[in-house]
């Protein structure tokens, strides 16, 4: 029986599917020498770079792949075969912009809310995951090449993700991430690094620069030799930042080595080193955020607050084709060292390690096609957590010595049964058991004088069922019901203030999500639209104790809440062959509607959950011709800002940002671009450290991250 037909990518993927590449390697990145090499790229390289100069109106054909890493076309097809809301982003859609953070790569994906705080620190939320957390990541699994980046307790941050080291991004919203074993409310985002087979070119040199004394250098080299292939990518970024005390220094190194052990058997090793030194500007009052946005919080300066992270990661995937399907076995280990002077000096060092076999195959059942995925995941980790009095960013007297341990055991499966040629019934489930153990070793004055320990085990089953109807090759309609569980991480469980540290037993967040949607293309019109509703019990809700001092938020279980919304992206080819043969004008509209609120809460009633605005819109108009010129003006519009408190007594203003991107791709493999943002220098609030009731804070909460003002960046890239 023939395979079910997957939705073909639209001609202009940036208009729809993009909504919906240790120190030894880094030493290669000398700034002046890199710029010289970029400019020196010659036309003799043109033949080898033809694939890197892509017309937006070309449909990408089959690209090279390997057993461990499918081609980009196959990655897209696998994502689009999902019964549920997903998105695929090809790196070519953001390589001609200043892509420093995940916002720069995901801002065209409906349903994904990404807002900058400072440097690479973001609020990243899908369908309200971790909605009111004012730092890092919760409720969403972040993977690289299908292998988790999150720590064993489920927490994560964004500093390991280098946009210049990526080939594609896969977004699986909510329970649709079951293909990885992820069943959190937000789902999973899988960033895929290039291999020698999928890289744009064997050699890539790039330098970006611009506002706030920003300069970034990137180099990538890849080769194939018989059964061996390798790729090395390194990026150095230096920037003073928009605000005072926001200096950013990062060094990212990614590499992979593939080897064909035997015909049809392949292993691939991944290695990464990620060094971050980020000064923290802190939050401001609403007045200062809107009128003096470049200021730093005085407490941030007095405490020389910063975040210094050294992370090393090694992983392996070994793939075996079987008589039916393919077996992948993933193993990984992550070492992370954190030095983080904020209200106190947070000094942590820990390891996360895991193994995950995964089988996927297609076979017939009574003459009907059946697609089956089965997987196991076992991962654990331990983190030494010390705290000290913060003396201008240096360790003072020690106040805490603790050990945080987490373990997780999971089994999952998903089946698609094609009972009609164009209709599939999907069913799946995940069973899990997760333990969190905290041991305070004591020995200090005050609340941490005596040893104390606590642990909690969370277990459950998350089911999933749905239907996929594909009446045409370029049209899908789907509906599904999924269950999710979010287990608290140690930032939730270990709550602290200036006086003590306490382990708080919290319940796991449970949700049932209903969604229905459609995606496809008919002639010049492309779309991806999903409606969803999540009924949530015991949602993990955060509020900041004192955001001005950068004290981590407290967490509680809200008895009942509801998240519902619309995720929509629509693109229309307005004109073709407008000025010359092969050029096109495309308009795209992305709309994310967020309705997140308490349900008969004993304290907050039916109030909106603070932290995320109700509507987020983005409009992009793109012109591109066959000679390589492209220009894209865009508007980011938030009609009404988010509430700053769960009492709904304070709301930040809405805003609109005008941006323009332009560039030229030369035939010799050299590309140049300009990325101009917030051209009107609008003053706005980008993110909030949510409080319970702003009316009770004397002088008003110091809880606001100002948005970045007018900024212009440019870059030059050579692929040969």
Kindly label every feature range from the protein language model.
Residues 75-76, 83-86, 103-147:
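Extracytoplasmic beta-strand/coil segments of soluble accessory domains associated
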Residues 147-173:
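Short acidic/polar hinge/loop motifs at secondary-structure boundaries
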Residues 202, 209-238, 243-281, 306-315, ...:
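Transmembrane beta-barrel wall of Gram-negative outer-membrane proteins
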Residues 317-321, 326-339, 470, 476-482, ...:
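Membrane-embedded beta-barrel scaffold of Gram-negative outer-membrane proteins
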Residues 365-379, 402-535, 622, 626:
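Structural signature of Gram-negative outer-membrane beta-barrels, strongest in the C-terminal barrel
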Residues 537, 575, 585, 637-642, ...:
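C-terminal beta-signal and adjacent terminal beta-strands/loops
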